[in-house]
Amino acid sequence: MAEQLWKGRFSKAVDSRVNDFNSSIRFDQRMIAQDMRGSGVHATMLAKQGIISEKDCEDILNGLASIAEDLASGKLEIDPNAEDVHTFVEQTLTARIGDAGKRLHTGRSRNDQVALDIRLTLRDYSHMLQGYIVELIKVICKKAAENTTAVMPGYTHLQRAQPITFGHALMAYASMLLRDLQRFEDATARMDAQCPL
């Protein structure tokens, strides 16, 4: 089991059910790339401000890159017993590069780190979904253009109404998806406007 950061506050071992309840690793393992990206930017800032040495920054960045490579290749797996992804990265990094890994969190609370990770993850998912929506709209528009003469009934309040083309009906969905795309763009702009770095 990965070592809990807060274990020193207790004289007895914590019940495994409490550990299971407190663990967020199953959820936040999907944020590991964003966690390491945010940590890399934070380390760079610390070095630029003279808070850590350039050598420590280089070691941290190289260590984070090696963790990312090993995760991608399957050489390293996220420890399911780790309390959260942040602890896993910190402990893995410190095991690889030594004390420089412990200096990574200078001037940054865990809450700051979590807020950044969530925002970066949501932004990444938003961009991904926007790409899927754009591709779907393109496919719908192509099919609509191919069906400009295929007649079908239009519906008003679930009742058959005037005749329309199948292409026209498809374009209604393209229009709805375009509104969804605009909502994602707006949400992403709001995420970008208040980056917690």
Short names for language-model regions:
Residues 1-197:
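A helix-coil-helix interface module used to build multimeric assemblies
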